[in-house]
Amino acid sequence: NQYLNILNKKKKALQYESKLGIETSNIYLQSYFLNPLNNSIALTADSLTNKLTWQRIKPYIFNTLSFIKKKNTFALTIPIEANFATQKDNNTGQKKTYTNVSLNPRLDITIPLTSKLEMQIGFVKQTTIKSILDTHDGYILTNYRTLRQNDSILPVEKLKNLKGSFAYKNPLNGLFIYFTTSYSALKRNLLLSNTYNNSLTKTLAIQRWNNQYSLYFTGYINKFFLTAKTNVSIVFVRGEIKNLQLLQNTETQISSTINEIKIKTTVNKFSWGNFENSLSLQKNKSKLFQMRNEISDIQNFSIQNNFKIYFFLTSKFSTSVNTDYYDFKNTQAVHSKYFFLDWGLRYKFRNIDIEATITNITNNKVFNAALLTKNTSQEYDYKIRPANALVRFYFSF
């Protein structure tokens, strides 16, 4: 990645800069499967091998206009980019190409409203050509039990994102507040659908531009109480996503909402110990529409709470208790509740710390979890280690 700074002018707080450069990327991918009866012999069927080369050449011109006065900042970047991407299958000699010229502006503005309150506004437009791992004719082992194949044209994404935020900082009172909102419009040149056959997953693609829209609101409040030596933080997220996907070869509109709040409290006031509690509440909802008719409505609600307490019995001897509580349920009659309890002792002797812990005292042996996405519902059963004891030694020199 090389660039040349061809112009740089400064006048007081105003600065203009232009850069001319070229960026190149080269990726090589080779994959195959071995014969299970003889690991030294590779299976060479076309559907089981990949031998691909991917190259992208991107010449560009960056024009940046910035203004800085005290804490007010303004930065406008207007890059002009040309993309020449080629992917070649060295087994068949076939090539996939993509060429375009794009204008991808970026705007960042920071305005201090008071000595403690600041506002930020940002906009970005970006074009991305997906890499070699997003399109391949042969199957690839994506995890220990899933094979995936996607033989589409080169995937391209065009993103527009607008965001704004307010930040309040008062270190003397120990109060920090942040609010952020973000709107994104993502345009793709492929409409995707996954088909499943036991462990095989094949991605089908239709060459059609489609859009995904998302809107997020995020808030963060943190307050430290000096006298009580207590810190409280609250995080909340509200998100809405709408997109189009192929389900059973039928165009399906997907609408999802995410609501989450996290509360964390830490107390360090007492000489005999301290404690920490983290609570997370989440409610998600997904709706699917075909031909403007609702075909699915999935809702799920989860609670997760973690509580830790430490007791300092002497200057060298301490004990701790750790609990985890999970409660998950949804409209598909899935309901799981779990309670975990751990207990530990720690003793410091000269340069050695000795720690003994008993984990999973409640002796849970199976953990059931459900994964709900925009259009899929999956349930997992994990076998976990029953109640057990462990001793650790820590040495310091």
Name each model-derived stretch.
Residues 1-397:
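Exposed, low-structure sequence patches enriched in small/polar residues
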